[in-house]
Amino acid sequence: MSISWADSYVGQLRALAGDRTLMFVGARAVVRENAGRVLLIQRSDNGQWALPAGAMELGESIADCAVREVREETGLRALRVSAFALYTGPDRTHTNMYGHTYQIFTTAFRVEDWDGEVTRVTDETTDARFFHRDQFPAPLSASVPETLADLDVFEQTNRLILK
């Protein structure tokens, strides 16, 4: 079960900062099964299909954040993760549907080992399923194709992607 928005680090910071632009540090995770299908979640806030992702909380590492988000949004337990891309910079600034602006710093992780059964509906999701890349549903978050393309490059070069 996830913590409430008001109790989250970003929620508490937003309450103090008002409408000022905030830095948002988060993680995104790519979970694949043996046939190569990718796990996507359908977000309950905007209906988009996306990779499991979310904000880092005080007291956890960025890898812990990825593991926690996978658990909260899919029910799976990520046993081993490795970072493959960092997304930073002012071009990563986003205003959400509530009018709050964030400059986003995201670390993308490959989940190398996991166990459990997918929970299709959670506090943050309305669905979660594995899809072949050529059969992704709409509406699809713009971060999905970019992240998967970067994972492909990482797996060919073994070099961290910096954007």
Cite the ranges covered by each PLM segment.
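Conserved Nudix-box catalytic region and its N-terminal flanking loop in Nudix hydrolases
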Residues: 33-73
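Short, well-ordered beta-strand micro-motif
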Residues: 31, 108-112, 129
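A generic structural micro-feature
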Residues: 19-23, 98-105, 122-125
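Short connector loops at helix/strand junctions that flank enzyme active sites
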Residues: 24, 44-46, 51, 78, ...
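Acidic, metal-coordinating catalytic segment for phosphate/diphosphate chemistry
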Residues: 1-28
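A short coil-to-beta-strand element that immediately follows conserved catalytic motifs
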Residues: 77-87
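Nudix hydrolase/Nudix homology domain
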Residues: 47-48, 118-163
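Active-site-adjacent beta-strand/loop module that shapes the phosphate/pyrophosphate-binding cleft
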Residues: 87-117
